[in-house]
From Swiss-Prot:
Basic and acidic residues bias locations: 151-161
Coiled coil: none
Species per Swiss-Prot/TrEMBL record: Homo sapiens (Human)
Region Disordered, annotated ranges: 1-21, 142-164
InterPro entries per the UniProt record, alphabetical: R3H-assoc_dom, R3H_dom, R3H_dom_sf, R3HDM4
Gene designation: R3HDM4
Occurrences of domain R3H (ranges): 187-250
Disulfide bonds: none
Highest taxon above the source species: Eukaryota
Protein's UniProt name: R3H domain-containing protein 4
SUPFAM superfamilies cross-referenced by the UniProt entry: R3H domain (SSF82708)
Subcellular location(s) of the protein: Nucleus
Main location (coarse class): nucleus
GO molecular function terms listed in the Swiss-Prot or TrEMBL record: nucleic acid binding
Amino acid sequence: MVALENPECGPEAAEGTPGGRRLLPLPSCLPALASSQVKRLSASRRKQHFINQAVRNSDLVPKAKGRKSLQRLENTQYLLTLLETDGGLPGLEDGDLAPPASPGIFAEACNNATYVEVWNDFMNRSGEEQERVLRYLEDEGRSKARRRGPGRGEDRRREDPAYTPRECFQRISRRLRAVLKRSRIPMETLETWEERLLRFFSVSPQAVYTAMLDNSFERLLLHAVCQYMDLISASADLEGKRQMKVSNRHLDFLPPGLLLSAYLEQHS
């Protein structure tokens, strides 16, 4: 714990302490929050106050005495670099005419007593402890990114084993798989729909393909092709006819390496 010397204490208060000094916990020696100079300052000035305070604290560390002192100084400068990059427009105060902007992370931290306490606790630690904290935060950020997986736009279907021909066929509903295995499938019709979908979504992967189909078996084949290609298909009544709508759930269109018609021929 950081302690301050109390010059007003008498001899009776110095008992039990080396040198006759009385040490008080830091929180009890601080002025009240309501009368604090930092409280009366704007957010930008308050940010600069904490930065200057950190710089002054770092200047107290001898810069040419040992590896630990140098490491502590480098950690402090590294944190200040991160914090300064999060600030707003330079030279603008609260009263200046400027477009409203949401407060940065550092401004919010300066207004939060818990964050300030954590920052002070970090600054009071040794250089080795600070290094461990920074290393832990970096590792934690990388592990969270791995847990989130690929972001939107990162398509890994080519190397994903879930997109092998067998897994693509298993993606088709059980009822449709039974029909494809037991019935005599008109391969020409199946290949025609595969060719149409390939041509359409290869050019416009985010568009919606529509078709009017009154034949229920042909709609069934189209549903099967869409499920095999990982497309979304739905049918609805439109002016007494059945309309099919097909859309792509991904940003890009990557068809399986083996089409459904070829897969059925291999396993017939």
